Design a protein with these regions (language model features):
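Short, polar loop motifs at secondary-structure junctions
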Residues: 9-12, 280-282
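Conserved beta-strand scaffold positions in the cores of enzyme catalytic domains, especially
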Residues: 4, 24, 298-300
Length: 316
């Protein structure tokens, strides 16, 4: 009898017949603080042992420098890229020391301002909340193979004789279905939003999710799409610093979604202060350490009408 242990970053690439025969154990990605601790205890000491700077002493990285590498030079749930970047820093420093016959950094310590010299311009810019003054733009929370991310749902209207729904942004089938479902819900509850039903016959609706080169799918953007539609159709703007995640049903019920821990951290990184999610996700929040949710206000809802009440401002 042979026992196989396999690892994968993305289950979507595994053939279904093979996946059905596997026992799945999902391992959560590391938090930024956990990555910093792994770097401090393991990755940096490993490089220090391999590269001896002799009379110049032991090369060190400040915690702030390590965090900068994690945030702007890696995008992963693990620490593989982080290890490569730290290795690159040590090798580049060794080269500069050998060429110039002196340590290029004071007290053999690398600070945040030194990182760009060693690694070049940062390839990633961690998501930040984009305060907007436009109706129809809503911030959502997504979970990906590299951790939590924030995304923006944009809805615009254009005058037309024959109304149609256009979806762009490299959306998968499930996300497209969520958009259709959200629109149908709003149509059937137009009176509650003080909408003239004829608006659906005279205007084209365009829903877009930026960063079109990145594929997006899943049901968790349901309430975000519904709120974006409601905002655009009523011209009511969305509250500042609010994000949301949750699946929506045709009856307007908000269902729980996964990846809550990662989404919460993405929201906090982006400067979000208020998060809307399903009441059934309350238990997930209770399992997260208090330090990670400090400064965040959670709004737990059962139906999408509650989402509109929380997220949409009264003034136009």
């Amino acid at each position: 009898k042979v026992f196989f242990i396999a690892t994968a970053n993305n289950l979507n690439t595994i053939p279904t017949p093979l996946l059905d025969r596997m026992e799945l154990i999902e391992v959560e990605g590391y938090l930024t603080e956990e990555k910093k601790e792994i770097a401090r205890r393991h990755l940096i000491p490993k490089e220090q042992k391999e590269l001896d700077f002799g009379k110049y002493g032991t090369l060190k990285l400040t915690p702030a420098a390590t965090e900068l590498i994690i945030e702007k030079y890696t995008r992963e749930s693990g620490v593989r890229q982080l290890e490569k970047q730290i290795d690159k820093i040590f090798r580049k420093t060794a080269y500069l020391t050998a060429v110039n016959n002196e340590m290029p950094f004071a007290k053999s310590t690398i600070k945040p301002q030194d990182i760009e010299t060693l690694l070049g311009k940062p390839p990633y810019n961690r998501d930040k909340y984009q305060g907007n003054t436009y109706a129809g733009v809503v911030t959502g929370l997504a979970w990906t193979a590299v951790g939590g991310e924030i995304l923006f749902i944009e809805t615009s209207l254009s005058k037309s004789k024959a109304s149609k729904l256009t979806l762009t942004g490299n959306l998968g089938d499930v996300m497209k279905e969520s958009a259709v479902l959200a629109l149908e819900y709003i149509k059937s509850h137009a009176e509650k939003l003080n909408l003239d039903y004829r608006i659906f016959d005279n205007w084209d609706i365009h829903i877009h999710v930026p960063e079109g080169a990145t594929p997006k799918d899943g049901p968790s953007a349901g309430i975000t799409i519904a709120t974006s539609l409601a905002s655009a159709l009523t011209q009511r703007k969305v509250r500042a610093n609010i994000a949301m995640t949750g699946e929506i049903t045709l009856r307007g019920k908000v269902l729980p979604v996964g990846g809550i821990k990662e989404k919460i951290l993405a929201a906090k990184r982006a400067g979000i202060t208020d998060i809307v999610m399903s009441e059934e996700n309350r238990k997930d929040i209770e399992e997260i350490k208090a330090t990670y949710i400090d400064g965040l206000k959670f709004h737990f809802v059962d139906n999408v009408e509650e989402v509109f009440e929380i997220a949409l401002l009264d003034e136009i």
